[in-house]
Curated annotation (Swiss-Prot):
Signal peptide range: none
Organism phylogeny: Bacteria, Bacillati, Actinomycetota, Actinomycetes, Mycobacteriales
Protein name, per record: Putative 4-hydroxy-4-methyl-2-oxoglutarate aldolase
Cofactor note: Divalent metal cation.
Gene3D superfamilies the record matches: Ribonuclease E inhibitor RraA/RraA-like
Domain of life of the source: Bacteria
Native source species: Mycobacterium sp. (strain KMS)
Swiss-Prot/TrEMBL catalytic activity: 4-hydroxy-4-methyl-2-oxoglutarate = 2 pyruvate; oxaloacetate + H(+) = pyruvate + CO2
Cofactors named for this entry: a divalent metal cation
Keywords linked to the UniProt accession: Lyase, Metal-binding
Annotated InterPro entries: RraA, RraA/RraA-like, RraA/RraA-like_sf
CDD domains according to UniProt: RraA_family
E.C. code: 4.1.3.17, 4.1.1.112
Keyword Membrane applies: no
Amino acid sequence: MTIEPRATADLVDDIGPDVRSCDLQLRQFGRRPEFAGRVTTVRCFQDNALLKSVLSEPGDGGVLVIDGDGSLHTALVGDVIAALGRDNGWSGLIINGAVRDASTLRTLDIGIKALGTNPRKSTKTGAGERDVPVDFGGVTFTPGDVAYSDDDGIVVVTP
């Protein structure tokens, strides 16, 4: 199911004071600055095996929200994992953590927002949780919500 991106500023105006807008100032990395889709979540800390497994599945235009607990010590997503998500139909990634291969990420047709970069690899033990509510930036991202992302920020809506 494809969900068309909408301007987050317009969503804020439409929703009003109860809007769920992420307060973290995430940076744009992927080639697609505007993206939207149903939320799937992963919570992991400096380990990207679980999120790679999720991105190996059909994304159906969804958005994978990855809560890496704000760690910038290792990158959770690099060019290989981002390309996997793109190839499997994910519209975007929202990462409370770091990425690497930033120059290559800018060429991939997928939305990617993250805190920053670090060239260091993550571990790959599979530690983490999937499809659980995750909280960062003053927002709870719940599986099945819809996330809208653009240059102004991220808005989350419960359908």
